[in-house]
Amino acid sequence: MGKDTIADLLTSIRNADMNKKGTVRVVSTNITENIVKILLREGFIESVRKHQESNRYFLVSTLRHQRRKTRKGIYRTRTFLKRISRPGLRIYANYQGIPKVLGGMGIAILSTSRGIMTDREARLNRIGGEVLCYIW
């Protein structure tokens, strides 16, 4: 039985966000590096650095905690992450069937033949792939 590094990454970010932690440390693989780069580009993460500890590499990410102000006061927005395609049930979509998360407000991350990219990039390039996760 193998490890699901994508699920570990999403769970670490979700747990740190719920506990209001500033940083998250996850094991660095090619897939996790590409997903974290997308999260950084889309504004869900403030910064990322690579850290080496006894011949193993880790990604240390600083989370972005957004605060919204309403008439009733200030509240903190949460980042929702959901794993879609998993090792036991792979989910694929062609470019016409790529789902829009919250009507375009969120993003879907896909693994395509041209690398890991967001749903918008995959639609522009007219390629489909495996739907890895939703983030909103």
From Swiss-Prot:
Biological process annotations from GO: translation
Superkingdom field: Eukaryota
Alphabetical UniProt keywords: Chloroplast, Plastid, Ribonucleoprotein, Ribosomal protein, RNA-binding, rRNA-binding
Subcellular location: Plastid, Chloroplast
Pfam families in the record: Ribosomal_S8 (PF00410)
InterPro entries noted in UniProt: Ribosomal_uS8, Ribosomal_uS8_CS, Ribosomal_uS8_sf
SUPFAM superfamilies in alphabetical order: Ribosomal protein S8 (SSF56047)
Coiled-coil boundaries: none
Stretch forming the signal peptide: none
GO cellular component terms attached to this protein's record: chloroplast; ribonucleoprotein complex; ribosome
Function of the protein: One of the primary rRNA binding proteins, it binds directly to 16S rRNA central domain where it helps coordinate assembly of the platform of the 30S subunit.
Family designation: Belongs to the universal ribosomal protein uS8 family.
HAMAP family reported for this sequence: Ribosomal_uS8_B
Quaternary structure annotation from Swiss-Prot or TrEMBL: Part of the 30S ribosomal subunit.
NCBIfam families: PRK00136.1
Designated name of the protein: Small ribosomal subunit protein uS8c
Source organism phylogeny: Eukaryota, Viridiplantae, Streptophyta, Embryophyta, Tracheophyta
